[in-house]
Amino acid sequence: MDAESLLLALELASGSGQGLSPDRRASLLTSLMLVKRDYRFDRVLFWGRILGLVADYYIAQGVSEDQLAPRKTLYSLNCMEWSLLPPATKEMETQTSVVKGRFMGDPSHEYEHTELQKVNEGEKVFEEEVVVQIKEETRLVSVIDQIDKAVAVIPRGALFKTPFGPINVNRTFEGLSLSEAKKLSSYFHFREPVELKNKTLLEKAELDPSLDFMDSLEHDIPKGSWSVQMERGNALVVLRSLLWPGLTFYHAPRTKNYGYIYVGTGEKNLDLPFML
């Protein structure tokens, strides 16, 4: 959700229980504007909160002029002092995939994991137990990146692609119509497309290249991993991810108000295919 309209955005997303105390809201409003100025971001998004056992991580993201360029991620424990996180890598994801359970809320906390490594002694090969330490900060980076790739959402038409390449905010976007807002096909993943290149030429011919340049939610696997609900007498559409419980996307049809927020433990619902 855009930091500049934070209070309205939190109000619209509050149906899922994603609220913040008045002092946290005031701190965020001020500190995110300073983050935008100091890091020279085009936009700052309040991404959400990852709940820890000792403390919670408040997450913000900086967006450059090209809206699909990699976003810079920052975290804070008090909503005032922000620290920049390193970019996520495949190695981080592999390393942290073995860590299960809740976050602690301490970036310097280290998880211990025992794994078997092959050791050569002459012609003989032995398997030796090695204790690997994984920092919570590394796990935080990896989980945020996974959530972004899987469930960050944007409505169709909110961004447009110029013939020269850069992707910009569509200043003429006036919101989806009520009938369009109820369809999953009207929402895209807010990331570089992955499935788009697999479409046939006939399917691509039906798309508008300036608007349909991202992957649609309607083809997400497993099918049924999104819940779409109309609230406030059809004045608000709310999408909730069942794969990453805690992710809520909201959009008020026929207005420019949209955004998403994640408030959860940072754990994926791996049982979802068996629950549907």
UniProtKB/Swiss-Prot annotation:
InterPro entries: RSP9. The keyword Transferase does not apply. It is found in: Cytoplasm, Cytoskeleton, Cilium axoneme; Cytoplasm, Cytoskeleton, Flagellum axoneme; Cell projection, Kinocilium. One of its GO terms (cellular component) is axoneme. Keywords: Cell projection, Cilium, Cilium biogenesis/degradation, Cytoplasm, Cytoskeleton, Flagellum. The keyword Heme does not apply. GO terms for biological process: axoneme assembly; cilium movement involved in cell motility; motile cilium assembly. It comes from the Eukaryota. Belongs to the flagellar radial spoke RSP9 family. Functions as part of axonemal radial spoke complexes that play an important part in the motility of sperm and cilia. Essential for both the radial spoke head assembly and the central pair microtubule stability in ependymal motile cilia. Required for motility of olfactory and neural cilia and for the structural integrity of ciliary axonemes in both 9+0 and 9+2 motile cilia. Component of the axonemal radial spoke 1 (RS1) and 2 (RS2) complexes, at least composed of spoke head proteins RSPH1, RSPH3, RSPH9 and the cilia-specific component RSPH4A or sperm-specific component RSPH6A, spoke stalk proteins RSPH14, DNAJB13, DYDC1, ROPN1L and NME5, and the RS1 complex-specific anchor protein IQUB. Interacts with IQUB. Interacts with RSPH3B. Interacts with RSPH4A. Interacts with RSPH6A. Interacts with CFAP61. Interacts with LRRC23. PANTHER family: MITOCHONDRIAL RIBOSOMAL PROTEIN S18 (PTHR22069), RADIAL SPOKE HEAD PROTEIN 9 HOMOLOG (PTHR22069:SF0). This is Radial spoke head protein 9 homolog. It comes from Bos taurus (Bovine).
